[in-house]
């Protein structure tokens, strides 16, 4: 195959897969487990946002036995119609603001453009509804982070959950099971990487993806520490960026004044350990999310490697495979995570408990990236990272 054909094939693949991760559907499920319903109640859900990758319909709310999708919305009529068709829903609204006036809706999935996430989630919560949101929680704005945080705390009894897909990657799930059982001890070193090559701007509402700072979209990589350790956080960071050769990552050519196509952060963790978290938009090659963890009593990279036989025996008693989902709900994309995120949000409401990726987890992943980008703009200056508890 000639170089021209290889290049053409690569370009075609990029067109067919504009967003990385949607073709990654394999996952490790405990085949002996059986899903047991928590209730026969159906939560009435509204979904907002269809977008470039049909995201509002991608997490399976329409297929969950405890959900009735009663209304959908997108600002563009053709996309709204597509979302309604995918969700098998007849009622549509022209905007999120109109949808949340519907008193029959109990919960809303916000799958809108990233800059709108905090404002939209605040509006949903203030309308008296639970909210699940696509990543990231906020868009480069610390004030928005604190405002969202205070709104969630003020609206006790309503759930906020961020749908970070790495949470249910096989490796992150397995590490979390071992960590929460006390098998690993403290986490010494974590790595998370998110690679998504786009040599040209991807479409986005009002151009929000144009030249976006890599560490403003940090949660896929940061989850390899935060979600692997059940919610621990980062305390300080030194981050470096690479000034990209691509025109849309020239500071004068994008709305963020961002010169970087790749940013790599070295962070101190709340356990006293270290984490290296990378996000890259301008390096060709394999794309997706990956990571690894090294702890006091063992390491996990595709498999668990214990320090000794005693730890190995203890680990053998922990089920590190994901449990069964409702038979009608597929695990979905991004490492078989979509269905699990949907199910966790639904069951957290049914059981009146906090969801797994609550506001603290969400902001501890997102804000660390915001500070990392600030550090990169200051040539790696070490900066403190705010931490959130809930």
Which residues make up each language-model segment?
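Predominantly a Rossmann-like dinucleotide-binding segment in NAD(P)-dependent oxidoreductases
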Residues: 154-161, 166-258
């Amino acid at each position: 195959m000639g170089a021209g054909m290889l290049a053409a094939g690569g370009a075609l693949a990029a067109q067919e897969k504009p967003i990385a991760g949607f073709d990654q559907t394999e996952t490790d499920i405990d085949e002996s487990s059986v899903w047991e319903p928590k209730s026969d109640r159906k939560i009435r859900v509204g979904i907002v946002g269809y977008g470039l990758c049909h995201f509002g319909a991608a997490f399976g709310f329409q297929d969950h036995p405890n959900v009735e999708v009663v209304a959908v919305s997108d600002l563009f009529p053709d996309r709204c119609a597509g979302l309604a068709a995918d969700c098998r829903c007849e009622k549509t609204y022209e905007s999120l603001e109109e949808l949340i006036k519907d008193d029959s809706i109990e919960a809303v999935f916000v799958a809108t453009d990233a800059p709108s996430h905090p404002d939209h989630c605040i509006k949903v919560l203030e309308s008296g509804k639970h909210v699940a949101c696509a990543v990231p929680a906020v868009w480069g704005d610390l004030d928005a982070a604190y405002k969202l945080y205070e709104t969630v705390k003020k609206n006790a009894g309503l759930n906020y959950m961020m749908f970070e897909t790495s949470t249910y990657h096989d490796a992150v799930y397995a590490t979390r099971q071992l960590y929460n059982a006390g098998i690993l001890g403290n986490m010494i070193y974590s790595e998370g990487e998110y690679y998504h090559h786009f040599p040209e701007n991807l479409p986005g509402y009002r151009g929000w993806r144009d030249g976006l700072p890599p560490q403003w979209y940090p949660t896929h990589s940061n989850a390899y520490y935060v979600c692997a350790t059940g919610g621990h956080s980062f305390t300080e960071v030194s981050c470096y960026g690479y000034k990209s050769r691509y025109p849309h990552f020239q500071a004068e050519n994008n709305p963020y004044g961002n010169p970087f196509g790749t940013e790599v952060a070295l962070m101190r963790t709340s356990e006293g350990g270290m984490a290296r978290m990378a996000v890259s938009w301008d390096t060709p090659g394999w794309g997706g999310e990956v990571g690894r963890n090294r702890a006091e009593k063992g390491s996990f990279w595709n498999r668990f490697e214990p320090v000794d036989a005693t730890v190995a025996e203890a680990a053998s008693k922990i089920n590190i495979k994901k449990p069964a989902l409702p038979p009608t709900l597929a695990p979905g994309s991004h490492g078989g995570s979509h269905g699990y995120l949907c199910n966790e949000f639904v069951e957290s409401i049914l059981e009146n408990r906090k969801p797994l990726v609550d506001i603290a987890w969400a902001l501890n992943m997102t804000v660390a990236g915001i500070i990392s980008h600030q550090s990169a703009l200051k040539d790696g200056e070490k900066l403190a990272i705010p931490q959130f508890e809930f």
